[in-house]
């Protein structure tokens, strides 16, 4: 069954909601990177956040990248997403697997750490991308995304992200929701939504009970004039290519590329997002070096 993402509004546009079921794409991502359970939960939460935030982009050419690194054993997680809800990502240490936290859950916050920052980089095709940077709040990802929206974009936001890792290390359930109060929204409405989110409980527990993201929307907003705006099919998809790798090699500059050429070896470049291998003979490196000198 394909993953799904739904965009909606409630209360005459006072509330914006994006909810996603991301089990398949998270499964694909953690298999590519051969993640241990805690690493799988960390990468999965970031992929889910990336998909939802990517779907907020207005142009097909816009790109958003999220980077979180709090100095923990995960050694940082990076995801890149697009307006079509495609996403890719990687974790610095896919083998990280900590003891359960005090709540008996996978210790994502401990793996990511709290001594660092969350970067949100939006590339709109201009000369310079827009970069937002906030200190890590808890390292649990959802709290940090909510903190970013509230502090950096002055948009009160509730974020719920969840990844349930099964005994065979596959992803049993994964999903997320981002709820934002639009300018001028009733403050009492925000309190009501907060209470309902508490009643909803864990997103993965909700989904694991046989319910869907449609049920989640109805549970939270059924009596608030809920309007579905759009439904999308998010996917884990890497857009790497030999041509892009060639451009990346050229971009490192003549000095560094010449050092690679002088080694006289065949170079193998591995895409950090999907694991695809690209080999370049010494002769091919030489041709790229000529292009740098032009």
From Swiss-Prot:
Keywords: Chaperone, Cytoplasm, Disulfide bond, Redox-active center, Zinc. Disulfide bonds join 238-240, 271-274. InterPro entries: Heat_shock_Hsp33 (IPR000397), Heat_shock_Hsp33_C (IPR016154), Heat_shock_Hsp33_N (IPR016153). Its main location: cytoplasm. GO terms for biological process: protein refolding. Coiled coil: none annotated. GO terms for molecular function: protein folding chaperone; unfolded protein binding. Pfam families: HSP33. It is found in: Cytoplasm. The keyword Disulfide bond applies. GO terms for cellular component: cytoplasm. It comes from the Bacteria. Under oxidizing conditions two disulfide bonds are formed involving the reactive cysteines. Under reducing conditions zinc is bound to the reactive cysteines and the protein is inactive. Redox regulated molecular chaperone. Protects both thermally unfolding and oxidatively damaged proteins from irreversible aggregation. Plays an important role in the bacterial defense system toward oxidative stress. Belongs to the HSP33 family. PANTHER family: 33 KDA CHAPERONIN. This is 33 kDa chaperonin. It comes from Clostridium novyi (strain NT). The gene is hslO.
């Amino acid at each position: 069954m394909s993953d799904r993402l739904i965009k909606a509004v409630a209360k005459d546009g006072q509330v914006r909601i994006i909810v996603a079921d991301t089990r398949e794409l998270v499964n694909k991502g953690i298999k590519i990177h051969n993640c241990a359970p805690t690493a799988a939960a960390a990468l999965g939460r970031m992929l889910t956040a990336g998909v939802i935030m990517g779907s907020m982009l207005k142009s097909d050419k816009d790109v958003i990248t999220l980077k979180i690194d709090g100095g923990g054993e995960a050694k940082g997680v990076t995801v890149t997403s697009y307006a079509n809800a495609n996403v890719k990502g990687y974790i610095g240490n896919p083998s990280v697997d900590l003891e359960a936290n005090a709540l008996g859950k996978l210790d994502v916050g401990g793996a990511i750490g709290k001594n660092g920052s969350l970067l949100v980089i939006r590339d709109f095709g201009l000369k310079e991308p827009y970069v937002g940077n906030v200190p890590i709040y808890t390292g649990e990802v959802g709290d940090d995304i909510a903190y970013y929206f509230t502090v950096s974009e002055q948009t009160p936001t509730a974020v719920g992200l969840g990844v349930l890792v099964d005994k065979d290390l596959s992803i049993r359930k994964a999903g997320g929701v981002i709820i934002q109060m639009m300018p001028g929204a009733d403050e009492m409405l925000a309190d009501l939504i907060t209470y309902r989110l508490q009643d909803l409980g864990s997103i993965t527990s909700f989904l694991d009970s046989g319910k869907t993201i449609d049920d989640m929307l109805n549970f939270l907003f059924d009596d608030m004039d809920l309007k579905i705006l759009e439904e999308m099919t998010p996917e884990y998809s890497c857009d790497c290519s030999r041509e892009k790798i060639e451009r990346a090699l050229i971009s490192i500059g003549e000095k560094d590329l010449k050092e690679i050429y002088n080694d006289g070896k065949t170079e193998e470049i591995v895409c950090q997002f999907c694991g695809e291998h690209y080999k370049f003979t010494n002769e091919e490196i030489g041709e790229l070096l000529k292009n740098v000198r032009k």
